[in-house]
């Protein structure tokens, strides 16, 4: 797999709580220059970012982030607001308290409500795999499939661990047809990126891959 093909799977991400507009601009410029799938940024920057890229790049943002335990109504509002401001893709965090209570029906209904507001915009569902048992992850693969969401996503990048090869393998085995996989958190090398893609991920959430590619380009004058 060529580097350009890897870059097409990347949601180039900056979700730091202290992210400044110049830092967001750099993310947007790099994402456009390297033709990544999207730039994933805080919701407060979506409107300004959408105006800045002027249709040249998909803008992704997060809702219910990073803990997921805001109410469904709050998440629905966040979704509507983000789309109104120009977001093309939404990454939502599920309520893990519902998961731990065994209330998967409530998790599914919340995703359905948010997907209804997304309409033709892409919805990715963050399940925070580092906090799940294997059995919970398998159950959530079914929940996300039935909900109509477009992607199941491993991690926020703000919890105890990010994506693992094992979790992506489980997702690839148990998620239904039509649901794609996004691996996110801790992807720090091109080799890891290739492995995640080989295991079934079609999106990668990372802030590091472009830095690596830039370093390689400096050495070889190409990527």
Swiss-Prot record:
Q: Give one GO biological process term.
A: 2-deoxyribose 1-phosphate catabolic process
- Catalysis: reaction(s): 2-deoxy-D-ribose 5-phosphate = D-glyceraldehyde 3-phosphate + acetaldehyde
SUPFAM superfamilies in the record, alphabetically?
Aldolase
Gene3D superfamilies with a match to the protein in the record? Aldolase class I (3.20.20.70)
Q: Which GO terms describe its molecular function?
A: deoxyribose-phosphate aldolase activity
Subcellular location per the Swiss-Prot or TrEMBL entry: Cytoplasm
Pathway involvement of the protein, from the record? Carbohydrate degradation; 2-deoxy-D-ribose 1-phosphate degradation; D-glyceraldehyde 3-phosphate and acetaldehyde from 2-deoxy-alpha-D-ribose 1-phosphate: step 2/2
* Enzyme Commission designation: 4.1.2.4
Q: Which GO terms describe its cellular component?
A: cytoplasm
InterPro entries assigned to the protein according to its UniProt record, in alphabetical order: Aldolase_TIM (IPR013785), DeoC (IPR011343), DeoC/FbaB/LacD_aldolase (IPR002915), DeoC_typeI (IPR028581)
- EC top class named in words: lyase
Q: What does this protein do?
A: Catalyzes a reversible aldol reaction between acetaldehyde and D-glyceraldehyde 3-phosphate to generate 2-deoxy-D-ribose 5-phosphate.
HAMAP family listed in its UniProt record: DeoC_type1 (MF_00114)
Q: What is this protein called?
A: Deoxyribose-phosphate aldolase
To which species is this protein native? Streptococcus pyogenes serotype M2 (strain MGAS10270)
Taxonomic lineage is: Bacteria, Bacillati, Bacillota, Bacilli, Lactobacillales
Q: Which gene encodes it?
A: deoC
């Amino acid at each position: 797999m060529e580097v350009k093909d890897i870059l097409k799977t990347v949601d180039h991400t900056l979700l730091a709580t202290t992210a400044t507009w110049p830092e967001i601009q750099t993310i947007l410029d790099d994402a456009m220059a390297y033709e990544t799938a999207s730039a994933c940024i805080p919701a407060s920057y979506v409107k300004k970012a959408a105006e800045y890229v002027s249709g040249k790049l998909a803008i992704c943002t997060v809702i219910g982030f990073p803990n997921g335990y805001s109410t469904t109504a709050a998440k629905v509002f966040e979704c509507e607001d983000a789309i109104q401001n120009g977001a093309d893709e939404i990454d939502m965090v599920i309520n893990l308290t519902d998961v731990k209570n065994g209330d998967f029906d409530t998790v599914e209904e919340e995703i359905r409500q948010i997907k209804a507001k997304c309409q033709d915009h892409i919805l990715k569902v963050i399940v925070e795999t580092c906090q799940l048992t294997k059995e919970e992850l398998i159950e959530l693969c079914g929940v996300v499939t039935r909900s109509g969401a477009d992607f199941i996503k491993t991690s926020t990048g703000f919890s105890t661990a990010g994506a693992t090869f094992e979790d992506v393998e489980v997702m690839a085995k148990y998620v239904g047809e039509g649901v794609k996989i996004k691996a996110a958190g801790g992807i720090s090398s091109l080799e890891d990126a290739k492995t995640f893609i080989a295991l079934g991920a079609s999106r990668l959430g990372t802030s590091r891959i472009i830095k690596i590619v830039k370093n390689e380009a400096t050495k070889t004058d190409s990527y």
